[in-house]
C-alpha cells in the first residue's frame, strides 16, 4: 500500500473479549484502529463472561471492550473517532455470552450487515462514547 493509502475494510466486534483500551494508539493493538474504514462495537453490560473478564490477568483488573466500549476515545483524532460506532445491545442480548443471541437478533445482524457490506446505507454516524 502506497504512503497515504489505506486498505478499505470494516470491523465488527460482538461481545469483544479484549481490553477496552487496547485499540488506542501506542497500546497492544494500537495500529489496528486507523486501518479500518468503519468499526462497530457492541456493548452488553449484562454479559456474565465479559463481566468476569478481569479474571484473565492476575496482576491487573482489565475491563472487556464488549462490556464497557472503547475507553479513551477522547484521545483519538476526530477522523478516527468518526469511524467508530458503539451500540448498547444489553436490552437485546441480556445475560448471555452466547453467539446465537447475536446471530438471531435482527437489529444487530441488520446493523452488522449495513456496516460490513453496504457502507453508507443507513449510516448513523459514530455513537457517543
Language-model segments: which ranges?
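Lipolytic serine-hydrolase domain surface
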Residues: 2-129
